[in-house]
């Protein structure tokens, strides 16, 4: 009775095990099976029937036995037994290492999952490399399965068996074999174990690594499609060719499509021509296929051509417009995309922006140099398209084109309306911001009537200027240095010569100092404009104060890591900074020349106080870093902080320096080298709106309600002190103007009115475009003034270069 109960309980346990873990390999005791009946037996395997289930065991040695599965169905148990025994017996006979619990588990799992695999395939997958040293096995080393047609080599790679893979290749495994999808061992290595690729390449004599699968894809293409950087790197090192494909796309294109920039970088570093490779369908390059700002930035840094044409006649800028990828448009422009290039219909990006009725894009393209009078193949200008448009923004866009120089259509033009017809006088509608800026600029023109700028109106004898200095002074202002660049580009256009050749002295503070150095080193203004826009993303990272290493890396790259100030020969450059390790603080001038007057050091000064390096030892990038070390934005550079703390408008300091330079020449009996100042051009980074301040009172509070008034008053007082310390408009301009007027020196001050106080570290693209557009409006309003400056500078240049 008791024995029956125990047997019944064991039966229940066996059935439960058969239901919940039927295929887990378990170490069992031989004595537990002595009283059981055998259902089947084949070699090392026996199928027992016990307590309502069927138990398949493998006998390894007289004392070791493992249960492979436990099933309740007779038919299923018999089928599994025959499937496993037909393969496992062969494996056990040739590889004793299989007789371990883990190995048996792997082997039985593989047999159940891959019915068509032969013992050779299973041995390859499990890494039983000793299995392949026997002659009868070697004759079947390239056998394919009946279903997927995979070879033992492919299976070994799938199982990540490096040693077995190498053993198979040494014993004659063929790399030419392909499965029913056309995939080679390389394709399998890409998907399953890239570390096998170097082993495969050692036995590859015919560039099988570049074979296509059934889809026309090489192993490199598949690696790029799946974003497998290790596989891409291994294939490139093994000699894979990125130009080989039977698809429309090359590996680099599919890598970009999957947004894997690391793979693109790997390919393009080894094969730079892939930056310009064209896909077959449209003939587009990587620049055409970019989908986000980060992709464009990386491609541009790698050296792609942002103006390359596709086979359909489109630049990357045209494609980004059609795909509405605004961030990509901005990034392309920053890296030099040409807004004047047309597509097959002759439409420039400005034409397309007008057709899209997009005010922001119209502004953007005008700011970045679009020709507002270019005609497409239908002889239509952007102004004509705006005039005949029926969309809601047509009137504002028409006015934007008008003030940017957009001319009316010719008399023989067809389909014109009042906004573009030759005899018309309608020029569109001014939006509120433009109206405000243009009105304020008219006030600025009246303001200049009281300056010595009137001298530019006279017929100047330019020969008198041959022995006079032409001086350019650039204010500080962070990202608002873009406004300086726009005005300089306008002057450059008016003069018709590079801005570097227009001046003998260039000075700058902070952002103006960086710009002065860039100009003196021959960097084009459009390049500097792109650099400044990139600066907001590459330098202003995180929160204030920003890490200086990004700023310093950029400066070293752009200005040179080892170049010193005296490497700049012409024009002479002055960059301002403040020595903050002493009280009172002291203005310091970084010069590209040696001063003619000796500066004497106080013998009693502390030994640890910084002594600035002479010009022939002063690194250029460090001078720019020191001048731009704005408090709360960046940590100080050694003892230096931003020059704007004393000379945010460096005009008077520059004039003083030139006067002292001439005095020094006279003291050295070099009076023949003395040149007086001939003209001064001073550029500012914008005049912000005047706002109300309630109070600057700081007092002892008598009650809790006074605390808020105290805080507000203290904040206003601090702001006022900072504003006055960094003042660049108003009194500094008036003093400079008066200084020049008294000496009969032509003086020109340009500084646009802007609609808001844009922060020095502004990140927002829309805000940046807005202030650049307002500067464009200012340039248009002051065109006559700028033209006179350009005319004078060009006249002097022509006389000097006769």
Can you describe what each PLM-predicted range is?
Residues 3-135, 155-168, 175-180, 188-192, ...:
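Conserved catalytic cores and adjacent C-terminal regulatory segments
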Residues 187, 287-288:
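Extended, amphipathic alpha-helical scaffolds
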Residues 112, 144-146, 178, 211-212, ...:
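Ankyrin-repeat boundary/linker signal
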Residues 116, 148-149, 182, 216, ...:
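Start-of-repeat signature of ankyrin repeats
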